[in-house]
């Protein structure tokens, strides 16, 4: 049993709401909901909503709702191929500039699509070069193979399993881990001290990327959060769940309130701190 003097609550781990979590509602609605429910901040998914692409509009929302922007998700999705540019490096440069201007500590990046051949060839070295030019973390996110019936397609390069390549920081997405049928805790072990950002959502291993509310699938969401608390994780935990099936605004908010309560409960477990905690590497391995 831990002594009172050993008890620790992770004060620096902020819980943010991804603006994608309110889709099909707007980016502005995400700020409003995050403030009302008591989130620590937001992660802005840059996509087809014009407000998500407008730094000054985002700054006004952040100021009005007193909701810090903790991370910017670069426009890496199929539906955002023309957002900010058709050049993937320009997208990342603009995401970095947005993060710097808005005070966000992290830019979330997906690995390239396989058909982006030159971008994929240059990606690992290019991410290192960009990371060397800023204090903003470029946290590369684990993805998954695309599946249809019994067929599997490798859609990402160098690999959907980002731990196979050398990045300074990683994002772990638990829904993506479920879709790829990967052992999440093993992946976190491979990321080690380079884990810089967490997308918290649940999944059941479906071929579809489910993004369920934590606790509604088979991912070790609680164990992951407790491990983060135990190791002194210094990044952010972002709720990135799918609420498209919500029948009303009240139902959507109830799901997002449940996700926040789950996350804070398991980050606040009483543990014995690990001396020193994890350190973030800044050199290549």
Swiss-Prot record:
Name of the molecule in the record: Uncharacterized protein SCO3347
Family statement drawn from the similarity comment of this UniProt entry: To M.leprae ML2432 and M.tuberculosis Rv0498.
Species assigned in the record: Streptomyces coelicolor (strain ATCC BAA-471 / A3(2) / M145)
SUPFAM superfamilies the record matches: Xylose isomerase-like (SSF51658)
Organism superkingdom: Bacteria
InterPro entries, sorted: IolE/XylAMocC-like, Xyl_isomerase-like_sf, Xyl_isomerase-like_TIM-brl
